[in-house]
Structures are given as structure tokens and as C-alpha cells.
Amino acid sequence: MTIVSEIELERIRKLMREAGLGEIKNGINPVTGGLMHKMYRVETAEGIFAVKHLNPEIMKRPSAKDNFARAESLEKILEENKLPIVPAMTIKGMKMQAIDGHYYYIYHWLEGQITDWNTISEKQCYLAGQILGRMHAIDAQNVQKEKPSFMPVDFSSFLDLAGDLKPELKEMLSHHLDELSSVQTSILTAGRELPSMRVISDGDMDPKNVMWQGTTPFVIDLECLDYANPMRSMLELGIQWAGAVTYDFSKEKLLAFFKGYLEKYDNGYRSYEDLYGFVYQNWIEWLEYNLGRAAGKEVSSEEEKQLGESESEKTLKLIHYLSEIEPQVREMLANDLSPVCAQNFDTHDQRLCFFEIMFEGSLEHIPDYPLPEGYRIRAVTVDEAPEKVKQDWIEIEKSAREFETYGQGEEAWNRYYGSRTEMLPGRMFFVEDATGQRVATATAFFDIYGRDQSGAGWLHWVAVRREEQGKGLSKPMIAAVLKRLKELGHFQVKIPTQTTTWLACKVYYDMGFRPIPKNLVSSRAGWKMLEQLAGIRVL
């Protein structure tokens, strides 16, 4: 039985009074609150509440309050989107409450059950996957590629802490050093393969933090809410729900988790097998933290030191188990996930995971494609006002969803053509309808960054206004631009595009263009997406 100090009891009494929740009745009872913080069941005249005392040692960290504040703001977003969560109460405009230098969260008490890790059902995995999918769908964005932040840990250094680790733990750690080195290499590999996306996610949404009222789940303990990569977050949590933590991995449970997730959020990515290294990362970091606790770092009691020892031993065993099941899980991820459904996506869809795609091909034989009646193709002429050309170009690209705002279009125009407007006559083409309105565009150009020294011409910024799509305008326009590139002396063409414009990729493929070999390697996951979205089979 956990004994609560009188000082702690008095702080909680004071907390409830200052929060306006009344005097305590029926005592303050400790309940399971995880490994990091302490939790109490508190009953007052106003109701029953859960009170969480945040770990004082953690709160001393310079970044702690900022991290909690960020989680609180994201928790509010989940509340607004009506996700099934148990949020911290907002009292006097604040979620976190400070009492005598200690920090607390107060929650309405929820009667329910935490499912034992050993008895989780496939249905529960499916429902948990749905919640995570709903969470990720709220604010999913493609973002700039970031350098992986993981720094390998030299676990052998803990063996040098003479007398600080108990002998049994030292021996166990020594036995697993090679394995720890190997899995950290896998983490680094996964970091290089990880596409750059950002979503709201809860990295701690494992079974211990989902409470069930019958068959209805509620996510609790949301302090780990943050922006994260959806593919990594999904894989890490799915593996846990599938039984890996209890050394009883179930392929069926992992597939159920994926099924629920992909029903609520799908960015088209299907190369999760490349990311298995991330399954280890949180456990590597958890092991480092607990070895530190076991060695007496950042602990305030012998009890916490012993907890660090036991958690270190558990984590070493778990990392070993995860390495044993890795081949089985990789095979399942590569072959058994539901395929991407093209009908769920627009022709230009920013919800899709972004990969740069590069086609190339010969300009020796350019096919002819008839332009539908009532349309004509015209190149920009020298007597046209550059501002009008820019305006028409941006409006077409914006209609095709290349940009969300006119300002984004101006930024792209300035980057590609702003200092080169004198080159656009005879290179930039438009399709005009019967009224003379410009409805599609493409440009015969080159690599503006000067990296491509092959002498190939580049096909730039192909776009058709949304209301004109599906009328057969793109292929005749592309053919006209390719012929112009040939007239300019080019024998090859390169076509930069991306997975978010997957239907355009199909057009290029159908016209006979094929991936640049280097891009087929660097964007292999993107080409796998195109295989499922557009039937482009190059892998």
C-alpha cells in the first residue's frame, strides 16, 4: 500500500480549495498513474476527480513547462474536434495548477477499465487505430525535410559507472551491447527513409493510456501530445497494441490497428517496412533514462532508483524481442497492408505524402495528340506584358491546386521566372478556350539551379484549370512543349513532379517517360505509392 505524506495531502487539499472544487471527503487515494507521475482519486462535495502530481524532477528540466504548454494547446484542439479523450480541466484559464512549487493536473473522474496488455482484442486494436487516425487527420502537412535528431547512445559508458549499477544489470547490459549497437544503426537507417510530414500525435497512446467504458475507448494522460511524423507514430504505437510489449506479437492485431487507422487517415504511404528501426527508438531512449536512474541520476529516492533498475532490465529484454520479430513484421508490412485507393484522392492532393518524382525520356519521337475542338495552344509572345502572363499563370496553377494562395504563386513565379521573363516568349505555352481565356499552361525550360549538366531540357509547371481537367488538354499541350524543347536543341527531357500530383505522373508514364534511375532509388517509397495510385509499375 502506497503511503501518502502529510505534506502531499495538504498540498492536494489546498489545490482543491483554490480550484473551487470544495473540501475533500472520503480521503485522498493513490491510484496507478504510470511510471513518471503520481495520481490520486479525490472526492469533494463537487464530485470525484483524478489529480496528477507531475514529477518534480522532470519539472526542473528547462524545457518541461514549454513541452507541457504545447501539449495543453494541442489537447484543446482534440477537444474541439470531439476526439474521445479525458482532458485536463481548465481552472482560472489554466490547465496546469501550481501549489507550493509543485505542479498538478485535475481531471473529471472517469469510471472505466484499462485493458490488460495480455487481453487486448483485435477489435480494441481497430478502435485505437481509428482514434489515432482521426487525430492525425486534423492537421496533416507535408513539411521541409529535417535532419534526423537521433544521436546513438554509448551504452558501454554505463559499465564504467563503477559501483553505481548493480552487478546483475551490468552483466545484462554488457551481454546486449552488440545488439544495442545494431538496433541503433537501424534507427539511423529509418531516419534517412522517413518522409517529412507533420501531424498532431500522442506518442504515449498505448494500451495503458486508453480507458474503456464497455466497448467505448477514451484516451487519457495526454501530456505527450506534440507534433510528430505520422508514419513513425503509427508504426510505433501499432507494434505496441499488437502485443510486442508483452512478448506476444500478433500479426492480426497489427493489421487491425492499421485497418482502423487507414480508414480515418491515409496519406498513401505504404513503405512502413523501411521504418522498422523507429520501433526501437523510444525504448533506446527509455533505456538510457532508466540506466541513469539506476545509477542514481535525477532521482529523489531509493524507490525511484530501484524502479530505474527494473525498467532497465525490462527494456533490454523488450529490445531483444523486437529484434527477434523484426523479419516477420517487415514482411507483413511490405505485403499485407490494404492498398492505396486512388478514388479517395483528388488529382492534386496535399493529403498525400510528398516525394519528389523525376521522369526522363528521349525527344526523338514525340507523338501527336489532337486538341479538342474549340481550344488552341499559343506560346507567350514578346509583346505581351509580363505582369499579365504572370497573373494568368498563377491563376491556372492556383486553380489546379499547386498553390493555396496567390501569394504562394507569386513566390514560385519569382523563384522560377521572375528574373528570366525575357526568356518566356516561345517557351511558356498556354491552352486557350474559344473565348480566348487561358485554361492550361506548361513551359519548355531548364534546371534553374544549374545542377543538371546533362544538356536535357526540362518540362516545367504543367497545370490545367480544375474545371477544364478531364477534357484531353494536357497531352497535346505537353507534346507542343516537348517539340519546342527539341527545336531549342535538346535531345532529352527531364520532368520534375511529385506524388501529390499522381495523375500527372500517370500522364507522363503513359506518354512513354520513365523514372530517372537515381530517383527510383531515392524516392522508392514514392514510386510504390504511384504503383498503387496510378498503376505505374517500375519497381
Regions found by a protein language model. Give the residues of each.
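Active-site acidic catalytic loop and adjacent metal/ATP-binding pocket
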Residues: 32, 36-43, 50-51, 185-232
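Conserved GNAT acetyl-CoA-binding A-motif
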Residues: 485-497
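A conserved beta-strand-loop-helix scaffold within acyl/acetyltransferase catalytic domains
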Residues: 398-462
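Active-site activation/catalytic loop segments of kinase-like enzymes and analogous catalytic loops
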Residues: 231-266, 280-299
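A cross-family kinase active-site recognition segment
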Residues: 118-173, 198
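ATP-binding pocket architecture of kinase catalytic cores
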Residues: 45-143
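Conserved acetyl-CoA-binding loop-helix of GNAT-fold acetyltransferases
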Residues: 461-464, 470-487, 506-510
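ATP/Mg2+ or Mg2+-diphosphate-binding catalytic cores
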Residues: 286-344, 538
